[in-house]
Amino acid sequence: VRNQDLYIKHIKSGKETRLTDDGKGPIKNAMAEFVAQEEMKRMTGYWWSPDEKHIAFTQIDESPVEQITRSEIYADSIKTINQRYPKAGTNNVLIKLAVMDLASKQKKWIDLGEEQDIYLATVKWMQDSSVVTYQIQNRNQQHLALKAYNLSNKSQTTLLEEKSNTWVNLNKDLHFLDDNKH
């Protein structure tokens, strides 16, 4: 990721390919937003398929998020930084998820549903690279849904939902077996 856009680089040839070209200002491709990093420990916004033929990636729009001014203190200086910071109860980023076929460079935006005030908690591929899964959590963190997007037939299914009157905890325990069913 460079300058808010997604690039790939072929290891043997060194050839670099730019996959997105609309990252600028509040639009960022393949990057984890502040809440994902701080609260969900998700530090990336892109995920290679196991067969390396596709890549899933996020696009975030930070324009709804309030800007704050904060200080960074260094040994020899202090810098003032403007940062978009989603305070409790204020607007979060808008998030989208795409899958790109690396041979054709065609991307498909996955329908994350009508509710836009969501968190994208986790993205994982099934072992055979035919399905990308993702967990969406609502803003009050009382509903977590594990969904699957099938690349070949473009269908989406809900694999599992968890609801609570208080909140649903996130974890890093999501793992799929080689049978691509469990």
What are these regions, as identified by a protein language model?
Residues 11-14, 22, 101-105, 150-154:
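Short loop/turn segments that connect beta-strands within beta-propeller blades
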Residues 101-138:
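Long hydrophobic segments that form regular secondary structure
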Residues 19-47, 54-110:
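Predominantly five- to eight-bladed beta-propeller fold
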Residues 1-26, 118-122:
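A conserved hydrophobic secondary-structure block that centers on an alpha-helix together
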Residues 1-5, 10, 44-47, 56-62, ...:
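Beta-strand C-termini and the immediately following turn/loop, strongest in propeller blades
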Residues 86-93, 115-116, 161-178:
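Beta-propeller and related beta-repeat scaffolds in trafficking/envelope systems
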Residues 26-43, 115-120, 164-172:
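Short glycine-/Asp-/Thr-/Trp-enriched loop segments that recur within the blades
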Residues 15-20, 108-111, 155-160:
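Aromatic (tryptophan-biased) beta-strands that constitute blades/sheets of beta-rich domains
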